[in-house]
Structure formats: structure tokens, C-alpha cells
Amino acid sequence: MQSEMNYYKFDRAEWSQFHSQNFTNVTDEELAQLRSLNDEISLDDVKMIYSPLRHLIHIRYEDYQGDMFTLSRFLGMQRNPHTPFIIGIAGSVAVGKSTTARLLQLLLSRAYPEKRVQQMTTDGFLYPNAELERRGILDRKGFPESYDMELLIHFMNNVKNASGALRAPKYSHQIYDIVPGEYELIDRPDILIVEGINVLQLPSKQPIYVSDYFDFSIYVDANPDLIEQWYLERFGILLDTAFTDPNNYYYQYAIGDRADAFAMARQVWRDVNLKNLNEYILPTKNRADIILHKTTGHEIDQVSLRKW
């Protein structure tokens, strides 16, 4: 274990010593369903990395429930049993946030079978493409100004206040836009996992931040060169699956010259995703409670735990 600034740092073997014996039974078939397009995760990852992480979240969740009870007793109020414990997961495009979110949802659902554990992404709170075009910022999609932060914060406030069943806008990577009339239903979860590149950011014009609603936060980290490789691999898979569907956003690239398509993807990575990572996403890393660092093959080789 290393101690650096405000984090304890553990390599893979060291971290696995923390309650990996509480390995939750997960099958290869379940992992295959959880994986994002070109992500990689194994049963070894579940045992060595995610089982100890699940146990840490269990401890934080128990503490949270105790804090809520203490506050309710101080105020002389009955505690709302549906005030959720919210976990935020941040990191670059293509780094594997969605896989982490889905796996944690599975593990926590197994740990708390009587609880409602849900997962959502902030992609649905991007402005629709038509609105981005109207504002002249379609080429900055994914940057802070491309999100309807007021709507997202209003949504998070309603979730935290257990305001009943709520509808989150739905985003589709196939059409590269918000899906009109379709929503994800978030219905009074006990635990909610919120995944998105922007969840730890501090927008300058907001009096309250998305992260203010989090009770635990995770940043998925990797070398930008590796993330670019994963981004391009994912782009190739999207091309392979889009060429038969004219309604798919990637169809136009799938039926054209593949070299030209990848040249475009590299430019998007350089001008949009890498710039967004360096300027707005990476600076939020040290706000997370846990940093999961990935290396070749999406293997997590280091876990950093915030000291305070």
C-alpha cells in the first residue's frame, strides 16, 4: 500500500485482500450480458476488485442509514424510508463506466435482495441534437454546456427527496440523440447508481452540483492513449453492426470508406473527447472516493481510496 496526498493506493493483489472471500456468485454468462461493446471483465475481476468494493459500499451504506436515522431523530421527524443512497461513477468516454455501473447494480442487488437497486446514465440529459444545432454547439457535444444541467439537478433533487416514480430522458447511441417520447423509469430506489462523464464536474453557473447528491463516488481512470484505443475499437464494432440499418447514426460511415471513417473518428477523439477529458473530466478525478485505474485489456491494476 502507498499513501499519497489524500489517497491510499493499493495494487490489485493488495486490494483483493479486503473481503474478497465474500465473492458473490456471478456467472460468465451474466458478465457477458453486463459488458459494454468492447469492454473486458472477468470473474477474477469480480472477486479481486469488485467484491471488496461492494463490501466497502456496504459499510458506507450502513453508515448512511445510521446518519439518516440520527438526523430524523434530531429533527423529531419520521425518516423517509425511500431516501436513496446514491453512487456516482465518472470517467472518460469509452473507459468502461457503464460496465462498472451494471456490475455494481448486480452485486448490490444480490447483497440486498429486499432493496430496489437501479442504475441510470446522464446521457439522457444532453440537449437534443436539434437544440445543440440551434445553440451552435453540436461540435461540442459532451462538453459541460451541452447538458441541461438545470434539468439534471432538478431530477436528482426529486430522486433524493423520494418524490415518487420519475422519468429520465433516454439517449440512444444508435441514433446519436435523445429518443423522443422514451424514458427510463426511476421509481423510489433504495440505491441509485448514476453514471456519466460529467457527474463530478462543478459547473460555474450552478448553485448546487450533481455530486452534492452523491453518498459515494467512483472515477474510472486509464491512460488517454489506451482510452483512445478502446474508443476506436468500439467505433469499429459500431460500424460492423450498423451497415444493415439505414436509421443507425453510424450507417453513413459503415457503408463508406473505412479508412475515411476511422480518420473522422480519430479527429473526433482528438478535438472533442480528449479535449473534454483533459479540460473537464480528468480534473474531477481527485473528488472521487474511489479511483479504479485500468491498464491493457481493461484490467484494473490499482485502486485508490480517499482518506477523508
Curated annotation (Swiss-Prot):
Catalytic activity: (R)-pantothenate + ATP = (R)-4'-phosphopantothenate + ADP + H(+)
UniProt pathway annotation: Cofactor biosynthesis; coenzyme A biosynthesis; CoA from (R)-pantothenate: step 1/5
Gene Ontology CC: one annotated term: cytoplasm
Top-level taxon of origin: Bacteria
Organism the protein comes from: Lacticaseibacillus paracasei (strain ATCC 334 / BCRC 17002 / CCUG 31169 / CIP 107868 / KCTC 3260 / NRRL B-441) (Lactobacillus paracasei)
Single Gene Ontology MF annotation: pantothenate kinase activity
The enzyme's E.C. designation: 2.7.1.33
CDD domains tied to this protein: PanK (cd02025)
Keywords, in A-Z order: ATP-binding, Coenzyme A biosynthesis, Cytoplasm, Kinase, Nucleotide-binding, Transferase
Name recorded for this polypeptide: Pantothenate kinase
